[in-house]
Structures are given as structure tokens and as C-alpha cells.
């Protein structure tokens, strides 16, 4: 396996999907196309600009567009590092290492994917990669839902909430 190196990704877009939940599209340089190496279920380590936070933040990959050298991350603001990322705008850069992790091994045939809360985003890349019938069960705390519409073209979607 090739050694992963740190590179600078450029923010292409960022939006708030739900309170505290952000969608971030990153573009990668042609000479180190992280998107071409990524597969569903992997994650990226994002580094803060602030030297006081030495450890990177692991964020799962939501969507992969290898042809455009882009990856979409959907994350929850949970501390100072992710709060910093939520303020990034188009054209800003973020230091990234990845893709990391083993990822999923897609198989043909019927698939049932189950995810809740911030565990939902990696299900989108997986659902898009599967052949055959796909059903997705999503769990949310309340009626504020994210990524349901994104998953609908690729799977039958079922939702459960705590409220």
C-alpha cells in the first residue's frame, strides 16, 4: 500500500445541512488525487490551522468524485477543530492526510445499510457503489434530517426518529 502523505485540499463549497451539521466539498491537486485513491467507508484526517490542536480530526468520506478530484465530507461541529472547519469558505485550504482506513467491500445482491446521526454520511458513498437492491435505514434524534434526499436515488430509505 502506498504511503499516505499530507497535502493541501481546497474548499470548493461548504453549507450547513442541519444545525451543527456541515457538508464540505474538497478538491485535491492533480499530483496527489486523494479522491482517485478513496473508497467508501474510508476517512480523511484534517489538520487545524491552529497549532494548539496538534492531532488531526478524522472525518468519514461521504461522497467521492474521482474525475473532478473531489471528496465530500459531512461532519458535526463537536469541538474547536470542527468549529474551525465550519468557518472555511470557498478557496480556503485544509491540510489533509488520507484516505485512511480499510473501507467497505461492496458486494452484489441485496444490501441493507443502517446508520444513525453522524454515522449516516459514509452510507452515501457505499449506496452509490452497490449494485442490486439497496435499502437504507436512517436514525435521527428528531425531525431535523440530513442526507435522506441524497440517498433516495440510490436506495429505498426508511427513517426512524427518537421524537
Predicted regions and their residues:
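Ferredoxin-reductase
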Residues: 2-90
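FNR/FR-type flavoprotein reductase catalytic core
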Residues: 80-163
Amino acid at each position: 500500500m502506498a504511503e499516505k502523505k499530507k497535502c493541501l485540499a481546497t474548499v470548493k463549497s461548504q453549507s450547513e445541512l442541519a444545525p451543527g451539521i456541515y457538508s464540505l466539498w474538497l478538491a485535491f491537486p492533480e499530483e496527489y488525487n486523494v479522491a482517485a485513491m478513496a473508497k467508501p467507508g474510508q476517512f480523511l484526517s484534517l489538520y487545524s490551522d491552529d497549532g494548539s490542536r496538534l492531532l488531526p480530526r478524522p472525518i468519514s468520506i461521504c461522497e467521492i468524485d474521482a474525475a473532478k478530484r473531489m471528496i465530500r465530507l459531512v461532519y458535526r461541529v463537536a469541538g474547536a477543530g470542527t468549529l474551525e472547519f465550519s468557518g472555511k469558505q470557498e478557496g480556503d485550504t485544509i491540510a489533509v492526510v488520507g484516505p485512511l482506513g480499510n473501507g467497505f467491500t461492496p458486494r452484489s445482491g441485496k444490501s441493507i445499510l443502517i446508520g444513525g446521526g453522524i454515522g449516516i454520511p459514509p452510507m452515501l458513498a457505499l449506496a452509490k457503489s452497490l449494485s442490486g437492491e439497496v435499502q437504507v435505514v436512517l436514525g435521527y434524534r428528531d425531525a431535523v434530517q440530513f442526507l435522506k434526499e441524497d440517498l433516495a436515488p440510490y436506495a429505498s430509505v426508511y427513517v426512524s426518529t427518537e421524537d
